[in-house]
Amino acid sequence: MLVAKVIVPVPLDKTFDYIVGEKRAEVGSFVKVQFGKRSYTGLILELRNLTEESEYKLKEIADVLELEKIDTKTLQFLQWVSEYNIIPIGMVFKYLLPIGLLDSSSREIKTFKYSNDKVDNLTQKQKQLLDFFKENKDYYFSENDIKKNLNIGSSVVKTLLKYGLLEEKSEKVSSIDYNFNVNNVNLNTLTDEQNSVLNQINSHVDSNEKTILLQGETGSGKTEIYFHLIYNYLKNDNDNQTLFLIPEIALTSQLIDRFNKQFNSSIAIWHSDISNSKKRDIWLGVLNGNIKVVIGARSALFLPFKKLSLIIVDEEHDSSYKQVDNGCYNARDMAVLRAKINNIPIILGSATPSLESIINTENGKYKKVELKNRFGKAILPTIDIVDLKKEKNTILSKFLIEKMKEHLGNKNQVLLFLNRRGYSPIALCKECGHKFLCKNCSCALTNHKSKNKLICHQCGYSIDLINYCPSCNSKDSVIFYGVGVEKVEEEVKKIFPEKHIAIITSDTMLNINLMKSTLHDIEEKNIDIIIGTQIITKGYHFPDLTLVGVLDADAGLFGGQFKAIEYTYQSLTQVIGRAGRGEKVGEAVLQTYSPENIIIQALKNNDKCMILEFDKQNRELMEVPPFGKMAVLIVSHDKEYDLIKKIKEILRVFPVDSNLEILGPTQTIPYKLNNNFRYKIIVKTKNNINIQKLIKTVLEKVNLNSVKIKIDINPYNIP
């Protein structure tokens, strides 16, 4: 009797046996199976002949889907992702095939827009949704946008529609032609330096050195090299496919325009915001080999490529490649793994490479090529440092204001960078010290003045802004500490009332169309001043942007994270690099309370080596990645007593070993999230220890049914 080991998309780290019967099934085939009371699409991992009768009554595969089968290399990749990150194989399968994707056949998507607010007695969620539409009344949003940004379901949308508060529009979703014609390509000519780097990459690949770090200054033209590589691989074999990973999908609009212009063809874009029917088209096109190029966020790494020949990871240092929900993994590292399994080249590009990648070039695992000059006549911005200790509690220093006047007077654009969002981070009572905290989490609520609300940035809980203290009843006693984006906007409007301002944060850029519209306004010079947070550091090119002001250069330096030095240097280098990318000369102003700090000085002097050595010494001393292995176990439960009891049980199982260090348990930040208490255990080992095997062995000895546990191998941040 032929039996198939089938991966089922459930959060269990095991496969399930099904009888094949008379059906034609192969390893890698997609199949329909009954699991419990539900029907799922599964994936055959292995076939074997069962000679003896099973102690369980096996079910038969219901159907074998008429789809291309997954190759053995992709199956091996899924297994390695599961084992390395300690993620159940069923969850990893859902990365490859999200549940319900193949059921999506609709060619129509409904979007909604604000109509009016002439109805009283709305519920809190109905009012929240209506406020959202009112604040963005010029834009249509899909149910997917609403769910993603507000966690509000379709029933609330339908109620507002029934009341006549929203207007509805149906859009046909066309099946885009992704045909790629290598004879219809019009690539830009490379500079001598770019051409030299391209030749170096090809030489390394010919020598079977296929993992390559491309370090290039901001604005040096790394993307042009990517395009030439893509063209070469597609030209060499019509069946070849390439994957271009980017950290933020908001980056795609400029990148897609450049690609379409040079390749004269549409490109498949993969990210969470596209409709299920479009995802289905792309997924099937990748599986059958019709789609040749995919640009996407980290989830695109799990697409079922038929013949993947090249992977490019742009901004390889970016923390957005790290997934921290529904299984933790680093898409950059998993991309390197997939390239290794497929024996194909992978290019890791960045102006500010991660320390891990630099160490890998030093020990010979990766090869490194460099672009040292900006493209064309562009030069790196000059940098001035302002000591905020000499200023009078102002958001914008006198020096920065004068620089803004100078650049705006020359009809150029200014970017103000803030490492926060919201209006002011903390609301409290000046009389009794009461802090306004989220009822679900242990987080301080953030003041969003434009919405007149205090909002939790963890779970989305909000309350109306009040002028009295609910603890001591003092009136007009609520004060706010800290500076946020809205506060900066308020200050800028006072000084430059006639200038047009755009705010680019993860809060304001609610979907890709809104981001595209804002970027278009900037490119058309309808915007004078951009105020942004981390999202604005990512690879944007604005030729008329000549001044960058960093309002809080110290932010992130003293937060206790072991990667704080690297993160701060990377984000500031990237945002400074937005200035002067065209023919105009750029300037940057760093406002700081620590002007003598080694990172601030290294930025001013463009001294990468100083930062690198300083960071290496610190991490080597602490024995943290890449000079040791680390994992964080976050254990949670809605009852704190039961949680602590279970954590003690876990700790007792860890062996005593000189190569092993256990830190904790300690409360996470935030300590309470979505009504669950959370503690963390940090596991540190020498590099020669198999940390995954150690953790799995420990957890197998403990009954974890009563608690939730999240495992993060090589964490980016420790909560």
Predicted regions and their residues:
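Short, amphipathic alpha-helical segments that act as regulatory/interfacial helices
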Residues: 79-82, 130, 134, 161, ...
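Short amphipathic alpha-helix segments
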Residues: 608-612, 642-663
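Accessory, non-ATPase domains that flank or precede helicase/AAA+ motor cores in DNA-metabolism machines
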Residues: 1-350, 362-378, 657, 674, ...
